[in-house]
Amino acid sequence: MPKAIQISEFGGPEVLRLVDVDVGEPEWGAHLADELERIVALHGDTTIAAVIVEPMAGSTAVLPAPKGYLQRLRAICDKYGILLIFDEVITGFGRLGHAFAAERYGVVPDMITFAKGVTSGSVPMGGVIVKSGIHDAFMHGPEHVVEFFHGYTYSAHPLACAAGLAALDLYRDEDLFARAKKLEPLWFDAAMTLKGVPRVLDIRCVGLTAGIDLASRPDGVGKRGYEAMERGFHDQGIMFRIVGDSIAVTPPLIVSESQIGEIFDKVGKVIKALA
């Protein structure tokens, strides 16, 4: 029986929540990537196929990579011949003001996974972009071997492909990636109006995303976040994601300047009304 694939995790930007840092993309933390060196020393570089990372972790309420963190990962992977994979399911297609976060940060990974934004979320679809060397490794194998087996039941589903092509046309025709980049300073300033509001511990913004950490209640973690979600929906008519006692706000790329102000006005009212 083949040896099971093993996955090792090492400390990344999540550690930043344990220290006192500024909002936005942290200046401190690039050295956290050096933990990969320890993993390599422990297991050996020949046992590590790839490193996978989210350039901005959205499901943990917006954790941006510290400045220099992704560049350091790229350098270490190059040093040991390890593939670097960017999970851009959330960050791809304009969320950070570029087609992909790789472009924003100036780091070229070996593979990019994408989904969500490729169809603007209208139909489930995902895909992988690979460097030519990886592509060629599949395509230049023995003739009797399938180059890259991907003909699964829902692969290249016509509905998803049609939605993806339509979304890409709209992104191009309405220049939505550049629009998101232009709106980012306004989005940041609007989010920062919540700084100093009681129960707000930290605010993180990158692209058109914002994460707001709230102080937990003495009677349990997550209860304040849940109340915020309920109040947002029922009292203010706004929907946002909660992760424990953190709020994640990610508007559509067509959001207007006035709507940005309205969003954070409503979020502020929700937070101020919390028990």
Identify the role of each PLM range.
Residues E25-A275:
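Conserved N-terminal phosphate-binding loop of PLP-dependent enzymes in the Aspartate aminotransferase
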